[in-house]
Amino acid sequence: MGDAIVVRDLLVDRGGRRVLDGISCTVPRGAVTGLLGPSGSGKTTFMRAVVGVQVVTGGTVTVLGQPAGSPALRHQVGYLTQAPSVYADLTVRENARYFAALHGRGRAEADQAISDVGLAGAAGQLVGTLSGGQRSRASLACALVGEPELVILDEPTVGQDPVLRADLWARFHAMAAAGTTLLVSSHVMDEAARCDRLLLIREGRLIADDSPAAIRAAAGVDDLDEAFLRLIRAGEPGPAGPAEATRSRTGGMS
């Protein structure tokens, strides 16, 4: 089967600044991989490169065996951006059914996607009348309705209450158990423990790539917040460079 995503020496420059600096990593199939890091660390740029909509300076990104952005991937990759990507003048149901039709799916699949994100009670509402968190979930339903092999989710739980966050993560893991690969970004470190594997980015560099348990063990602490702080401090630029030094300590694949 191989890995769902293979990134090698990825470089991205934007506005005269290096946004991603030589990132190499893999994302295994059928698992939830978390992309963690502070705001502005390069998470969204990394996801855009995986989807194939980001101009890259160097390196390669392979997705499901194809170069990122290949036409063959259009119906295999679902992408949820931070900004709502649905039509405000249509209802939640109309949006979901429209995107379902684009993927050759029917009304039943659209209605199921709405239910899966907890919006069944708001299916008849215009998206423009929804709260920010509800709009995000409407976008999520549209990203999932095509049953893609790979789902890229950029901050999917921002603005959601704790109960709904838990429900969404349960849904993500159910999808992974059924064979879907998920790459989920967050700047909220308490969501890291919900992932099967973690990629930690800071200032455009990969400083950790391993399971939550292995990262805690490498840092010598039980708390992931503290583990990340220690890895960040240990990964300050030095002779070996931050990414290389930390990947060596955690034993992560890159």
Name the predicted role of every residue range.
Residues D209-D210:
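ABC ATPase "signature
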Residues V151-E155:
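Catalytic Walker B motif of ABC-type/P-loop ATPase nucleotide-binding domains
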Residues V55-L73:
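Conserved ABC transporter NBD signature motif
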Residues R97, A101, R107-A122:
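Conserved ABC ATPase "signature" region
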Residues V51:
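Helix-to-loop junction immediately C-terminal to a conserved catalytic motif
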